[in-house]
From Swiss-Prot:
Sorted UniProt keywords: Methyltransferase, Nucleus, RNA-binding, S-adenosyl-L-methionine, Transferase, tRNA processing, tRNA-binding
Organism listed in the record: Drosophila simulans
Chief localization: nucleus
Subcellular location: Nucleus
Pfam families: Methyltransf_4
Protein name as catalogued: tRNA (guanine-N(7)-)-methyltransferase
SUPFAM superfamilies: S-adenosyl-L-methionine-dependent methyltransferases (SSF53335)
Pathway info: tRNA modification; N(7)-methylguanine-tRNA biosynthesis
Superkingdom: Eukaryota
HAMAP family: tRNA_methyltr_TrmB_euk
Length: 256
């Protein structure tokens, strides 16, 4: 039977969602090409965000369905990108809650969809219930989500270098923000930084060493941390640097 024009159009419309389906039929995971966005976002711009007035108002159960009474987020991956390192954290620390914070809407949507797909694929084991992602501006709203001394670890992996001097104030590491990070970090908590830009690395080290509430881990201490090897290529940006045979600059700091 030959389809009429109307029937052919209906069939085409019915097939279109399959063609545009952002989920891979092979892996069951979302495909990045449907979530592409510019590499960086202006953190000073007046983006429209919903954010809690205080940490007590955060509905963590909506992000972590299996959260236990009194359990809190322990790790924050600030600027988590496409979530590669966040997934690694979930696998390495199944008893800890990790949050990814990402300012770009399409990228954060991808991470949310990725986590949902991983949870469906691991329904029999209950894996990946301990990771979540939220779209927010960590440079403005971090204290709205975390209480004093709550976090054990914070990660700043391959942040935007903002090369122009006039934009250095946009860098995620600066003196004012370091005090906010110290507020939400517990004593002894760790800040992990990694970049492939040497100038930014020197900037980070200088500012953190000048701040009275941080001290840099020795090379021996950093190498003994089981997280350190994962910092190089667990994230998508890190893996790209490895593929391009680029340099990595690592610095880890302890909250005093």
């Amino acid at each position: 039977m030959v389809a009429t024009g109307g029937q052919a159009q209906d069939q085409s419309q019915n097939q279109e969602p399959d063609v545009l389906n952002p989920t891979s039929a092979v892996t069951g995971l979302p495909q990045k090409r449907y979530y592409r966005q510019r590499a960086h976002s202006n953190p000073i711009a007046d983006h429209s965000f919903d954010y809690p007035a205080r940490p007590e108002d955060v509905d963590w159960r909506s992000m972590y369905p299996s959260i236990q009474q009194g359990q809190q987020v322990s790790f924050a991956d600030v600027g988590c990108g496409y979530g590669g390192f966040l997934v690694t954290l979930g696998e390495m620390f199944p008893e800890k809650l990790s949050i990814g914070m990402e300012i770009r809407v399409k990228v954060s949507d991808y991470v949310v969809d990725r986590i949902a797909a991983l949870r469906r694929r691991s329904a029999d084991t209950g894996a990946y219930q301990n990771i979540a992602c939220l779209r927010t501006n960590a440079m403005k709203y971090l204290p709205n989500y975390f209480s004093k001394g709550q976090l054990e670890k914070m990660f700043f992996l391959y942040p935007d270098p903002h090369f122009k001097r006039a934009k250095h104030k946009w860098r995620i590491i600066n003196q004012a923000l370091l005090s906010e990070y110290a507020y939400v970090l517990r004593k002894g908590g760790l800040v992990y930084t990694m970049t492939d830009v040497e100038d930014l690395h020197k900037w980070i080290v200088t500012h953190m060493e000048e701040h009275p509430l941080y001290e840099r881990l020795t090379e021996e201490e950093a190498n003994a941390d089981p997280i350190t090897p994962k910092l190089y290529q667990s994230s998508e940006e890190g893996a790209k640097v490895v593929r391009n045979k680029g340099d990595h600059f690592l610095a880890i700091f302890r909250r005093l």
